[in-house]
């Protein structure tokens, strides 16, 4: 309930606002806001800086993913995946003030990710981002469908799915649930990040902004539910196999 309330009261309205501004003023977030009123241009730089900071740690996580993709062929993590991740892969030190050595696989992974990003951006919107999205988005959806189908066939998957789809009405009155719901909507739709405003600046002149906002929000919502089914089915399997409650 809080999630859907957040979608209709914040997600879709703010998408319409950002799409509308980007479509009308034809520019990045700082430029679009500057074209409305020059003295408010600085507001547009806040989400731009935030997006750059997020990109920094996203690149790190993607580097981990690239490395683990190569590890998966030989199951390099062995029997103790936690110890491998923290000690062998990350090579964590005992204190934040204790500097360790350079972890070259992670650095090379980051360089690889940035090189791909640079190439896509260099090719522009139509030749880069659009072409990449036409390949990567269907691939992502296909992979998630395969994972979800496999997950629901696992022993104990129904335990996880029952947890997902059985409402706990006592949680509705807790503020933290509403904060989490709105946070999820803002994060997953990239609201107030400047991304949607910049993308919409490339839309054709006669684009139906309202329809685009609804389609984006509902498509995102559908993918999140597909992901939730896969995750909770796997959690149910893990809880059953370890004879634990799913909440643990």
Segments from the language model and where they lie:
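Membrane-interface alpha-helices at helix entry/exit sites of multi-pass transporters
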Residues: 1-2, 35, 42-46, 207-216
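Membrane-embedded translocation segments of transport machinery
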Residues: 130, 134-248
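Juxtamembrane transmembrane-helix boundary signature
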Residues: 2-38, 234, 238
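Inter-helical loop and helix-membrane interface segments of multi-pass membrane transporters/permeases
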Residues: 27-46, 61-122, 126-128, 158-179, ...
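Short helix-coil transition sites and intra-membrane helix breaks within transmembrane domains
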Residues: 11, 22-24, 55-60, 185-192
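Hydrophobic core segments of alpha-helical transmembrane domains in multi-pass membrane transport
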Residues: 6-10, 50-73, 109-121, 138-151, ...
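Hydrophobic transmembrane alpha-helical segments of multi-pass transport and channel proteins
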Residues: 8-12, 16-17, 57, 221-226
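Alpha-helical transmembrane segments of integral membrane proteins
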Residues: 9, 44-54, 133, 137, ...
């Amino acid at each position: 309930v809080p999630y859907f309330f957040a979608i209709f009261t914040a997600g879709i309205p703010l998408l319409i606002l950002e799409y509308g501004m980007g479509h009308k003023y034809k520019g990045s977030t700082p430029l679009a806001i500057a074209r409305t009123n020059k003295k408010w241009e600085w507001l547009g730089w806040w989400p731009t800086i935030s997006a750059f900071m997020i990109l920094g740690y996203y690149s790190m996580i993607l580097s981990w993913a690239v490395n683990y993709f190569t590890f998966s062929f030989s199951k390099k993590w062995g029997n103790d995946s936690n110890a491998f991740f923290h000690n062998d892969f990350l090579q964590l030190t005992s204190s934040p003030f204790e500097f360790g050595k350079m972890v070259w696989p992670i650095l090379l992974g980051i360089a690889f990710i940035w090189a791909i990003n640079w190439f896509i951006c260099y090719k522009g919107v139509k030749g880069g981002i659009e072409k990449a999205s036409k390949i990567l988005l269907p691939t992502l959806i296909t992979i998630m469908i395969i994972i979800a189908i496999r997950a629901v066939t696992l022993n104990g998957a129904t335990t996880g799915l029952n947890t997902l789809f059985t409402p706990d009405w006592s949680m509705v009155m807790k503020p933290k649930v509403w904060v989490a719901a709105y946070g999820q909507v803002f994060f997953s739709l990239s609201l107030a990040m400047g991304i949607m405003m910049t993308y919409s600046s490339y839309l054709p002149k006669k684009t139906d902004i309202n329809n685009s906002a609804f389609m984006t929000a509902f498509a995102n919502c559908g993918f999140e539910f597909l992901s939730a089914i896969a995750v909770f089915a796997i959690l149910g399997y893990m809880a059953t196999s370890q004879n634990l409650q799913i909440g643990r």
